[in-house]
Amino acid sequence: LPARMLNTIYINIFSTLVALAITIPLGIYCAVHKRSKSDNAVQVLSIVGYSIPVYIIALLFIWLFAVTLKLLPVFGMQTPGNNFTGFRAFLDKVYYMTLPVLVMTVGSLGGMTRYVRAAMIEALSMDYIRTARAKGLREKVVIYSHAWRNALLPVITVLIGWFISIFSGSLIIEQ
């Protein structure tokens, strides 16, 4: 694969993994604590985050992290003129991938959090959940062993389409 395509794949895979690591626990928490203040706050932030186009998030993050704070590079995938090897090359690549991965992750949090929450709320309202609670199972067992397993199927279905569509967004972010 060409280097640019490989970079796109790395950015998309890492941003998807980071987004899932955030959205799954957040969506489960919001579903379990439905209509609480924290759920309402997350829902408002999710809608706002979902409404902002990814290129606007990219411009804001470039301005904040690269221009104002000077923490991250604006372009490139490695330090110019240096041929690092081993772990140092890996750290250099991670440093240059941080801003695009951060933008792609933040751009995907809103929609996925809302979808995980909706799937979990639907699963938690099923009869088998009521039966599991009536049997005296611990709430963690009910949530993770019963509800999450059944909410996972629609989440995976949407995740596949979302992962494919994220490639089109990464073309804009990488420019």
Where are these regions (language model features)?
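Membrane-interface helix-entry/capping residues at the boundaries of transmembrane alpha-helices
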Residues: 39-43
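Juxtamembrane/interface motifs at transmembrane-helix termini
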Residues: 59-63, 76-80, 95, 163-165
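Short, hydrophobic secondary-structure boundary micro-motifs
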Residues: 1, 57-58, 73-75, 132, ...
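Alpha-helical transmembrane segments of integral membrane proteins
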Residues: 5-38, 54, 84-175
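Membrane-water interface segments at the C-terminal ends of transmembrane alpha-helices
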Residues: 45-76, 103-109
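Hydrophobic alpha-helical transmembrane segments of membrane transport/permease proteins
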Residues: 1, 69-91
